[in-house]
Amino acid sequence: MAITDSDLDLAQYIDHSLLIPTATSEQLEAYCQQAEQYRFPTVCVYPAAVKQAVQLLHGKKTLVSTVIGFPAGATTSAVKRYEALEAVDNGAKELDVVINLGWLKDGKSEQLFQEIASICQETGQTVKAILETSQLTDTEKRLAAEICMDAGVSYLKTSTGWFGGATVSDVKFLKEISKGRVGIKASGGIRTLEQAIALIRAGATRLGTSRGVDLVRQQKAAFEE
């Protein structure tokens, strides 16, 4: 199908992400305004910005999502749970949680399961497990996905964007593994309309990107050509 197909509402796929350590309150306000204007599902921000983002989006349809254990996933389970619960107390509705990659590679499947399951159960919110697929073999991707789905996540997410980004092949692989049990979030390095459409066609149900406005504008321009 052509990338300009009218059946695709690109904005409804985008988690509008502001995940740079130098982000200011002014930038956060601008991102929240953009998310409301373009009707993005969420604004994704660091935990320290959750409360302000919730205030800025009070009464709006756009939700606030945040990242947990970001970007390395190597904090303790207790710290991750606290970070997640505090974020929910501050109004976050979706949590993008980086899994412990060292545990995965060490074969500590039960510890990994318990960590993710506890966050899912204790917060009661939408949890997206960040697998960091660029750092994993196909066997490790499959194992991580199965553990996280069994633990109760709502999405499998490809990447933090710090160690490589989303690829069409990884999205297809996760879609095949998930068999429709969970959504697939592609994240990292999504800068062009062609990339976004390819990832969606491959099976992505969310896109994590800081370029959401640019992507929607690119699509609009393509329609008008």
UniProtKB/Swiss-Prot annotation:
Belongs to the DeoC/FbaB aldolase family. DeoC type 1 subfamily. The keyword NAD does not apply. One of its GO terms (cellular component) is cytoplasm. NCBIfam families: deoC (TIGR00126). The keyword Transmembrane helix does not apply. PANTHER family: DEOXYRIBOSE-PHOSPHATE ALDOLASE (PTHR10889:SF1). This is Deoxyribose-phosphate aldolase. One of its GO terms (biological process) is carbohydrate catabolic process. Catalyzes a reversible aldol reaction between acetaldehyde and D-glyceraldehyde 3-phosphate to generate 2-deoxy-D-ribose 5-phosphate. Keywords: Cytoplasm, Lyase, Schiff base. It catalyses: 2-deoxy-D-ribose 5-phosphate = D-glyceraldehyde 3-phosphate + acetaldehyde. It is an enzyme of class 4 (lyase). Its EC number is 4.1.2.4. The active site is at residues 96, 157, 185. It comes from Microcystis aeruginosa (strain NIES-843 / IAM M-2473). GO terms for molecular function: deoxyribose-phosphate aldolase activity. Pfam families: DeoC. It comes from the Bacteria. Pathway: Carbohydrate degradation; 2-deoxy-D-ribose 1-phosphate degradation; D-glyceraldehyde 3-phosphate and acetaldehyde from 2-deoxy-alpha-D-ribose 1-phosphate: step 2/2. It is found in: Cytoplasm.
